[in-house]
């Protein structure tokens, strides 16, 4: 995670175990938070406490605890769509939308 952060890569944190690793990385370098997104809230009992401690809001809450990266696979299209909306969607001004009645 720290090496990925140093390369300015996006970190998709998926589940409880990955969040524990993220906590360790965060304790070494808190700036890692600028590159991290929590994909989902696991059904593991401590995960909500851990994410709350880190100030993270997960993208999804589906009660998963499969340990197979499923939350990341489900969150990725949402993240990709959000990036495209931010980068490609026209503003009202650019699209010629007015308040005239």
Task: Identify the role of each PLM range.
Residues 1-101:
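N-terminal loops that bind phosphate or other acidic moieties
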